[in-house]
Amino acid sequence: MPKKFYVSWDNLQREARRLARRQLPVSQWKGIIAVSRGGLVPAALMARELGIRNVETLCISSYDHNNQRDLVVVKAATTAGDGEGWLVVEDLVDTGTTAKAIRELYPKAKFIAIFAKPMGEQLLDDFEVAIPQDTWIEQPWDMALEFATPICDEE
């Protein structure tokens, strides 16, 4: 079983804000391309921090929670053209398979992610947190808070 890295909502927002600060000035951006689904929340955070209201989606699928499978482009961000002036936002770049496809679709876009693993890191223009390749990231939207039984009541 791979190591796991758990991301809280607070941690995600803090890292997104740090990454957003490096994307200034805002005037250089026509909009954001949110990579669905993992990049939707980070893109919303970026849009808020940068004051960008033009948000497109690229619906691309290569994971079924824990399993990587064939890449499928469900919907492209057609108004973004070759990506010039656009900021592509993803939560994580892992092996680079999805990132390569995104680079082919939008070669002139700036491609950023909150988290990056070594195999995909070189495909990004910017990222905030380096994660070891053998570590699985659990994002806050995939988890739920639940009641923890007090130690004295565990028996």
From Swiss-Prot:
Protein's UniProt name: Xanthine-guanine phosphoribosyltransferase
PROSITE patterns: PUR_PYR_PR_TRANSFER
InterPro entries: PRibTrfase_dom (IPR000836), PRTase-like (IPR029057), Xanthine_Guanine_PRibTrfase (IPR023747)
Record Pfam families: Pribosyltran
Record keyword Cell inner membrane present: yes
A single Gene Ontology CC term: cytosol
UniProt-annotated location(s): Cell inner membrane
CDD domains documented for this protein: PRTases_typeI
Pathways per UniProt: Purine metabolism; GMP biosynthesis via salvage pathway; GMP from guanine: step 1/1; Purine metabolism; XMP biosynthesis via salvage pathway; XMP from xanthine: step 1/1
Protein's membrane topology: Peripheral membrane protein
Top class in the EC scheme: transferase
Positions bound to xanthine: 94, 137
Molecular function via GO: guanine phosphoribosyltransferase activity; hypoxanthine phosphoribosyltransferase activity; magnesium ion binding; xanthine phosphoribosyltransferase activity
SUPFAM superfamilies referenced in this protein's UniProt entry, alphabetically: PRTase-like
Function: Purine salvage pathway enzyme that catalyzes the transfer of the ribosyl-5-phosphate group from 5-phospho-alpha-D-ribose 1-diphosphate (PRPP) to the N9 position of the 6-oxopurines guanine and xanthine to form the corresponding ribonucleotides GMP (guanosine 5'-monophosphate) and XMP (xanthosine 5'-monophosphate), with the release of PPi. To a lesser extent, also acts on hypoxanthine.
Superkingdom of origin organism: Bacteria
Substrates-to-products reaction catalysed: GMP + diphosphate = guanine + 5-phospho-alpha-D-ribose 1-diphosphate; XMP + diphosphate = xanthine + 5-phospho-alpha-D-ribose 1-diphosphate; IMP + diphosphate = hypoxanthine + 5-phospho-alpha-D-ribose 1-diphosphate
Lineage of origin: Bacteria, Pseudomonadati, Pseudomonadota, Gammaproteobacteria, Aeromonadales
HAMAP family assigned: XGPRT
Alphabetized UniProt keyword annotations: Cell inner membrane, Cell membrane, Glycosyltransferase, Magnesium, Membrane, Metal-binding, Purine salvage, Transferase
Binding residues for guanine: 94, 137
Record-stated family: Belongs to the purine/pyrimidine phosphoribosyltransferase family. XGPT subfamily.
EC number, UniProt record: 2.4.2.-, 2.4.2.22
Cofactor list: Mg(2+)
Residues that coordinate or bind Mg(2+): 91
Binding positions (GMP): 69, 94-98, 136-137
Assembly mode: Homotetramer.
